[in-house]
Regions:
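Alpha-helix-loop-beta-strand connector modules within alpha/beta enzyme cores
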Residues: 56-57
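Conserved phosphate/ATP/ADP-binding segment of small-molecule kinases
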Residues: 50
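Aromatic- and acid-rich polysaccharide-binding/catalytic face
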Residues: 2-4, 8-47, 60-95
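Aromatic-rich peripheral "rim/lid" segments of glycoside hydrolase catalytic domains that contact
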Residues: 19, 77-112, 116-156
Length: 156
């Protein structure tokens, strides 16, 4: 028999807890980068957040916790420079692909999370969300395959 994990987005300073959580075998907590806050992710700030919010949730549930990390390689969310804002987030928009890709901010997000999580043995696992194994990409997507952030997982 397999395990049933419940997924829950982590978007605030607390994680909801419901009575049906007792039926789950563990939790898959979803972390998304905030492109408006790029450069603010450090192992210390992430570690403090994980210790205060995620560890409290872990203690209350006493079940395995897995973290799903998602960080697109956007440079900014500013769409004012585009005449076609309705299609700005499109792999076919060549102008968007060429000026709004920031592989470094994606890598910094993963560095901060991996460094913070590596010393916390109560975290059962880490996953990179949005991974696209069919092709190495250097675009704005969340996939780390073919990008500098991919190498971080090989060095752990």
């Amino acid at each position: 028999e397999g395990q049933v994990l419940l997924a829950q987005e982590v978007a605030s300073d607390s994680l909801a807890s419901y009575s049906f959580y007792e039926k789950a075998h563990g939790f898959y907590l979803l972390f998304n980068s905030d492109v408006n806050s790029s450069g603010t992710y450090t192992a210390d700030t992430v570690g403090s957040f994980i210790d205060s919010v995620v560890y409290s949730f872990y203690e209350s549930q006493q079940k395995p916790v897995y973290l799903g990390l998602n960080a697109p390689s956007f440079a900014t969310t500013d769409m004012s420079g585009s005449d076609h804002s309705e299609s700005i987030i499109s792999s076919t928009n060549v102008a968007y692909n060429s000026y709004n890709v920031d592989l470094e901010s994606q890598t910094e997000f993963y560095i901060a999370y991996l460094n913070a999580i590596s010393s916390r043995g109560w975290v059962s696992g880490i996953a990179s969300r949005g991974f696209f194994p069919a092709m190495q990409m250097a675009d704005f997507s969340s996939s780390i395959y073919g990008k500098p952030a991919f190498d971080l997982f090989h060095n752990q």
